[in-house]
Amino acid sequence: MEKLPSPIWVSVYSGESEPENYDLWVKSWLPQQAGVFFQDGVGVGVRTPEQARRILDQLEQTLGKDKTVIVLEAFRTKKNGQFRAAYPWEIISQIKAYEGKKIYIFDGPHYMGRWSVYIVGLWYRLVYGSTPATINEPKNSK
């Protein structure tokens, strides 16, 4: 991976609820120019949003905040092993746990219908008073 163009981002995942020294393990093989998309594991039921936040904080301390992003799983496992869309209140609990962090949603278009996006967006505006800066229209685009 060292020969790949920079920057490069790698998606990482752990099947353990709170893996020990996960941050150090990731650092041991991750090229210096790479960042990580840490998949939270909440959608598959491996961990809670709070557990995912602790792992994210460890990754940020070890790799740097500029090289670490959390990927919010917008789905849940059903009893038959298939997946369903996460309910808006489930997504909101994840967003609350990751407050102040850069969040990407997987798989937004597949698991987040229009009504779910509207509900989460309305909640965000009511709680934070605005749309996230990363979603706002750039100032120079007018």
Predicted regions span which residues?
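Glycan-processing catalytic domains of CAZymes
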Residues: 1-142
